[in-house]
């Protein structure tokens, strides 16, 4: 099958583009600004650029892959993005001979794509919003927060200081950060793996209707961040949660809290114990909360845990 020819656009001002050829994957690299990726029920992929400050965006469509980036920041995998900042004093580096620093740029873009599209985002100081995507979503961010709504594909997010909020995500969720936080609201995927150094984790699980699905697998690790997990009742998991010097709070009678001074643990089995819930932190607190049967109130960390 003959591959489609490469098509390119240089976008220096607000503009709308429609891509008649099929798009199976989008790759976006942004330095400052906002990037929105939204699933569409029908129609071709579309790009709306609302604002460009700095060098023009470089848009490429080839072989089902749509790339939105900059000409001096080509897509070359996550390693290529890292190399753009390393090996040079980039804060003093001027692009295009204009005297403008390479990082002094921003753009506001919205991509509307088929729901099955795979999404790869790499950002520095840019805010990301992804909604309704069923393909795999991969986010790499130095700073800047990301909001994920209604994703059903596998999600991987890696940040330095940016936080991630996931709402009604049903796919597997993996998160790695240094100081960014993770908030999961109405999480129905049942598979969450996250680790942080100092970022807090707030996990609200809506897992009441999981008949015939794989067991719940929650694994959270932090050094100094707080961890709060709200589980539906009845829950179904083996629980192992521990903190070396932080406090603990437990809302389940079937779980046992051990330890008085120093290390504390929450252990036991909820329901048949077919799933697993593991949470570990060194100096942060851990709270296991019961999710009300009715519409739940927003989850918040209680800094007064024992």
What are these regions (language model features)?
Residues 1-159, 163-306:
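Intrinsically disordered, low-complexity terminal regions
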